[in-house]
Amino acid sequence: DQRLRMKNAHLLLSFNAADALVTPTYFQRDTLPIWAHPITEVIHDGIDTQRVAPNPTANLTLNPSMPPLQVGDEVITFVNRNLEPCRGFHTFMRALPALLADRPKAQVVIVGGESVSYGRLPTDFPNWKAALLAEVGEQLDLSRVHFVGNISYAAFLSLLQISAVHVYLTYPFVLSWSLL
């Protein structure tokens, strides 16, 4: 408890010294101390809807081991900056065996690094990808599950444009920058 208070002290001091605060969501504003609400404006980060828009001719090949993908293919996407429990990676991986069994034509593309952004690495594995593959990997057809690491923003947009289903899991938090 004292350690957490110390970690938050600089934020509270900064809030107290501020004339105005900006946050992208009401949820995030509501996590601030009540006394900070009157000086807090909620302004969403915004999305460039000219650039982030459907493209019926979108296609993508991210690496030689996966098939070329295009609009109309049964593509399921999961994107995080880093693959970790705070962003639902463990839930997604545990759901994959049943999902792939129910959808025999589906290709799954998983985007994200192998470090952590919000939590800790697992104790018995080098990263959460390795931990979850140890748990469910034998139940997966890995020729249909593609871990592509971090990708360029242009590739990310194409991936979302061809995605039939984009899975976004997170604990109550803010909308992930990897989704914007």
Predicted regions mapped to residue ranges:
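Membrane-proximal helix-turn-helix segments that form the acceptor-binding/catalytic region
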Residues: Q2-L21, E135
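Acidic donor-binding loop of glycosyltransferase active sites
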Residues: D19, Q161-V174
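Conserved donor-binding/catalytic core segment of Leloir-type glycosyltransferases
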Residues: V22, P64-R87, M93-L96, V108-V109
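Carbohydrate-associated surface elements
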Residues: F27, G46
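Acidic anion/phosphate-binding donor-loop and adjacent secondary structure
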Residues: I47-P67, S158
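Nucleotide-sugar-dependent
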Residues: L83, L169-L180
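Nucleotide-activated donor-binding/catalytic signature segment of Leloir-type glycosyltransferases, i.e.
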Residues: G112-V116, R120-A154
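Short alpha-helical donor nucleotide-sugar binding micro-motif in glycosyltransferases
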Residues: N150, S158-S163
